[in-house]
Amino acid sequence: MAKVLYITAHPFNELVSNSMAAGKAFIETYQQQHPDDEVKHIDLFETYIPVIDKDVLTGWGKMSNGETLTDDEQMKVSRLSDILEEFLSADKYVFVTPMWNLSFPPVVKAYIDAISIAGKTFKYSAEGPQGLLTDKKVLHIQSRGGYYTEGPAADFEMGDRYLRTIMTFLGVPSYETIIIEGHNAEPHKTEEIKATSINNAEKLATTF
C-alpha cells in the first residue's frame, strides 16, 4: 500500500481552475485503480506553513546548541518539522499549481522550503549534495494561459522547471507532468484543452 500526498496550490476549485479539474480527475481515477492506497489532500492555501524567518533560523540554531526556544520559535520550528515528517512518510506526490508570473503561487515555495532540509531530504558529501528521496515519485499538474512548453516564451517558464530541479536535487527518480496551456492565448479552444487534460490525467492515474 502506497501513501500519496495530493498537494494543491490554487485558491479556487475544479469548477474554476483547469489544473484543479485535471487534478480531481487524476485523484478520482487513481483511487479507483489503487483502492488500497492512502491519499491525503494538502491544500496549501488552507495550511499554515511558517516561512523561514528570524524565529525559525534562531530556533534551529538554539536546538543545535541545546538552548531553550521562545514560544514563537518553538511553534514555528515544530510546525515545520511536522510538515517535513508528513512529506517523508509518503511514497508519491501530486502537485497541482497554476502558473503565476511565470512560476507558481508563493505557498508552493514555502512548502518546498519546509521539506528541503539537509540530513532529511538531502545530504552533503565530499562529492557534493546528494538527494535522499530515491524511492519517491512526483507528478506536477500545471495550468498556463499561454504557451510555455515550446516557442519564444519557453525560456521564461520557471515553475515546473524549478519544481523538477528541486525534486531532482532531492533525489526523486521519477518526475512526470501534465501541462495544460493555451486557453487564454486561444480562448476558442478552452473546452478542448480542458477535456484533453482531464483525459491525460485519467490515463496517467492508472500507471502512476
Swiss-Prot record:
Similarity comment: Belongs to the azoreductase type 1 family.
GO MF annotation terms: electron transfer activity; FMN binding; oxidoreductase activity, acting on NAD(P)H as acceptor; oxidoreductase activity, acting on NAD(P)H, quinone or similar compound as acceptor
Function: Quinone reductase that provides resistance to thiol-specific stress caused by electrophilic quinones. Also exhibits azoreductase activity. Catalyzes the reductive cleavage of the azo bond in aromatic azo compounds to the corresponding amines.
Name of one Pfam family that matches: Flavodoxin_2
Cofactor note (record): Binds 1 FMN per subunit.
Entry protein name: FMN-dependent NADH:quinone oxidoreductase
Catalytic activity: 2 a quinone + NADH + H(+) = 2 a 1,4-benzosemiquinone + NAD(+); N,N-dimethyl-1,4-phenylenediamine + anthranilate + 2 NAD(+) = 2-(4-dimethylaminophenyl)diazenylbenzoate + 2 NADH + 2 H(+)
Domain of life: Bacteria
Keywords: Flavoprotein, FMN, NAD, Oxidoreductase
Cofactor: FMN
Enzyme Commission (EC) number: 1.6.5.-, 1.7.1.17
Subunit structure: Homodimer.
Residues engaged in binding FMN: 17-19, 99-102, 143-146
